[in-house]
Amino acid sequence: MLFSHYCLDKPGAEGVRLENRDNHLEFVASYGDAVKIAGPVLSDDGEKMAGSILIVEHESLDAAKAWGELDPYARAGLFESVDIRPWKWIIGNPEDAS
């Protein structure tokens, strides 16, 4: 099942994000095809990274939450909020080539 991970950074935490970025990218990449979409949320002016959106395949909501807690960004205390929910891919899903 797919889950969306919508994470917003704490205000003023750009340094934490940059310090942990390489480890975060390595962590996400290590899950291979289970990660369907991933990228930063941007500030209103589009100039700074302000959070993360990931769509990831997990066995359950509990597994999604556990995976999210292992993210180096989460472990470093970057996020002000994290919202993880089941997600259904309707438009543009490459696995639904009907």
Language-model region placement:
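Conserved, structured core segments of small domains
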Residues: 1-98
